[in-house]
Amino acid sequence: GITWAAGGAILLAAWGWVITTKDKHQVNLIDRAEEKIVFGLNKAKGNTVFRGGALAPTKKASQRLVLPGILIGCKVSEYVDSWNRSFALVEHPNNTAAVVIRLTPAGSNLVDQETVDIQVAYWGQWIGDLSNESGITGASITIESLPDPGGRLNREVTSRRAANCPQVAGEVIEGVLDESTGSNQVRVWVTLAFNLAALGGRKNKEIAGREIASRLPGLTQGLVAAGGGATHLVTVNELARLVRSAYDPDSEELFDQALAAGQTINLDWPQSGPVFAQADFSSYRHDGAVSRVWTMTCPPRGAVQSAVLSRLLEPNRDVQRKRVTILYQPMDAAKAPSVVERDLNHARANAVGARPSARSINELAAASEVASEEASGAGLVDFAMIITATTTPDHLEDTSVTVNALSAASRLLIRPAYGAQDSGFALGLPLGLHPVNASVKARP
């Protein structure tokens, strides 16, 4: 009996050690084992490999290139808002829909700090007000940096250049075009996710579509005040090109060349998916490229300045294509007080002691301020971050080192989405998917 009791005590102690021992990402051995087991089961079932178009393993092969994984089943329709602007409405199988808005922010260069502070305040207010918007379940902002083929600048200059311009002016223009070769471009989108049932669209989605269309002018005006620049509602054709170039980066240059030649690109939504995609445990291969996805496990701590993410968001010559998506989800007003109170009590417990650290004192002050603002009527918003880097297989590890360094410079703690690279890739696209409502309905 004593031997069995001693053995049981040892097993309990070992089990407690396994559960309580966590790494810097707060992941224990059980969590890591679960990641590998779940991924292994999906791989054995063939769920980690996707083939589209004529290569699709279906009874009737087709030329359709549907989206893989958790994006299967999403549909796109086009509506017109109150300002007569066409926009794409992305409908997901879980009765949610999303609108994608293209922004043109000017950046922080040559902008005084007072203006930056005002824009940050407006952005915070815009995000906070989403909790008061009926039917909005979440929002996201996506910042993508990628090589610029140069066609956009060439088209803009050519269309504005006078035929009889002076020789000196012509040489300056040609110099600008030459210098743009090999440069980068930055694209920004904001995506709004809606609950169609809350907008009266469970049975009739046209009603929900018209309701969304009537509210877009006010929502986009708030983005302009927050420094978003001119706003543009993304159309179906533009959204299809956006998704297609994410899965097949080489198509970006083909689209640019077609536009430079004055051709019209007619890419339908069923043609926006990849021909081939394969999810590995720590990477995602798709149409000749490979991506790695990270998720944020700890946000910047302490005082957070407006430029804290600048190193991560700006283009980097060592990362061919980088996409950073911040997901926002308004918290239920009935749940917010208890969450704030719990955080405040936790901060107080950490600050109690003979010699509390400076960090714990600052965290207590921040928690107290949040509690005061929430009591005054401010809304709370949960947020997460997904980072996607796309490159060639030979440069994947070097790119990963650079992304980790950029994240550390931005005071972020990130971890690869082990066993969920394909889902992380889809969540990082500006299509309105959020982790709490994303699910796989079917596979082709």
Where are these regions (language model features)?
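Extended, folded cores of ATP/NTP-driven motor/assembly subunits in large transport
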Residues: 4-444
